[in-house]
A protein has these predicted regions:
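C-terminal alpha-helical cap/extension of soluble enzyme domains
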Residues: 2-10, 15, 20-24, 48-49, ...
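Active-site beta->alpha loop and helix N-cap motifs at the rims of alpha/beta catalytic domains
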Residues: 2-167, 319, 343-356
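Generic alpha-helical structural signal
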Residues: 39, 73, 77, 106, ...
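Hydrophobic, Leu/Ile/Phe/Ala-enriched alpha-helical segments that form helix-helix packing faces
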Residues: 45, 79, 83, 196-197, ...
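Residue-level recognition of short, well-ordered coil/turn positions
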Residues: 50, 117, 175, 201, ...
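Short alpha-helix boundary/capping motifs
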Residues: 73-74, 140-141, 170, 198-200, ...
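Structural alpha-beta junctions
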Residues: 83-86, 90, 198-205, 262, ...
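Catalytic alpha/beta core domains of metabolic enzymes, predominantly
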Residues: 144, 154-296
């Protein structure tokens, strides 16, 4: 099956740059999906002004694909149904996570299309023994079904290292429309941006930061390369981030502030860079960086639990839980950076929902 073209309004928004939260999974204590809270979470992101959602991704927990849980189609359907009304008023970018070997990935791509998703965010985790050529063939097959959102996921949370040569070939695939860089590494981030900049398709591919450790600096930086005597510029236009699954109203405000700063010839950039350090400190705690990200999903859940958007921090994997001392560190950042949270907005949102 050949895919449909990307909706022009969605493509315009994708290129301009927006906030795309990675959607978490709301569970009940018995590890079944909490439908009311799952749907309310989607509505919360839309109420914050997010320009899209990524569902079935790392933050949604890869375990949703295991037969004993079998929740991939459910989460895709719930989010799609909740987005439907809002999408009549403004363009929204619906991104579906896709992973696994080619047969599995193609089935997931078809499933994403069934529920009206615009792009597939393709994770290459688990394909560590595949050569660059095999990976490119895999990506070409997926791109023939759905527009592709490339994804550099750091090895610490299930990704793999990818060469500059891989990215150079990847960006030439005609239906690659965007790339999320979540390498958490400046060298590897540079590999991707250089590969995009070298391509004749450079202007067709939107770059989104997934580097939760460097969000503000990524969004403020212009990358320049001298290519055949011509200066080529490329920048991250938005973010597709697990960190933006929490305090999302503030994320939307932050991206708007960054865009305004750039438009004003970087007026106020010092203040933004200082904000960036705060965001990194908060992310280090939420993502449990000091314990190699073991508590990253539970950390997101804990913030949502405190706000009343989730009932608990339960995850499908027993390995996914808050690390020792992480709760106290979350207390610290709440105390130190109250202006960076959106608790008041969430209170108003939940009051309007009249559910909890």
């Amino acid at each position: 099956m050949k895919n449909a073209a990307l909706n022009p309004d969605v493509e315009k928004l994708l290129q301009e740059g927006t906030v795309i939260p990675a959607h978490p999974l709301a569970l009940k204590p018995e590890l079944t999906i909490d439908e009311d809270r799952q749907r309310a979470l989607t509505r919360y992101y839309l109420a914050c002004g997010a320009g899209g959602l990524a569902v079935g991704v790392h933050t949604t927990q890869f375990e949703i694909r295991k037969p004993e849980f079998n929740l991939l189609e459910t989460v895709l359907r719930f989010a799609s149904e909740e987005i439907q009304e809002e999408a009549k008023k403004r363009p929204l970018i619906k991104v579906a996570g896709i992973c696994g070997p080619t047969n599995q990935a193609l089935k997931e791509a078809e499933l994403a299309l069934k529920y009206g998703y615009d792009l597939g965010l393709v994770s290459l985790g688990g394909l560590n023994t595949w050569s660059d050529a095999q990976l490119i063939e895999h990506m070409v097959s997926i791109s023939e079904v759905i527009p592709v959102f490339g994804f550099y996921l750091q090895p610490s949370v299930g990704g793999r290292l990818l060469s500059f040569e891989y990215w150079r070939d990847f960006v030439e695939i005609p239906n690659v429309r965007a790339i999320k860089v979540a390498a958490f590494n400046r060298y590897q981030t540079l590999d991707v941006i250089r590969a995009v900049s070298l391509s004749k398709r450079s202007n067709e591919i939107a770059l989104y930061t997934g580097n939760d450790d460097n969000i503000v600096a990524d969004l403020l930086t212009t990358y320049r390369f001298d290519i055949n005597g011509k200066s080529i510029e490329k920048r991250f236009v938005g973010g597709l981030l697990g960190h933006w699954a929490i305090w999302t109203k503030k994320a939307v405000e932050l991206l708007n502030e960054i865009k305004q700063c750039i438009a004003d010839n970087y007026s106020g950039v010092d203040k933004l860079m200082s904000k960036g350090i705060v965001v990194t400190d908060m992310n280090a705690v939420i993502f449990d960086a000091k314990n190699s990200y073991k508590g990253c999903i539970a950390g997101i859940h804990e913030v949502l639990r405190r706000q009343g958007l989730m009932e608990g921090v339960w995850c499908l994997s027993p390995e996914e839980k808050l690390s020792k001392g992480q709760m106290e560190e979350i207390d610290r950042i709440y105390k130190e950076y109250p202006a960076f949270t959106d608790d008041e907005f969430v209170k108003q949102f939940l009051a309007a929902e009249k559910k909890y």
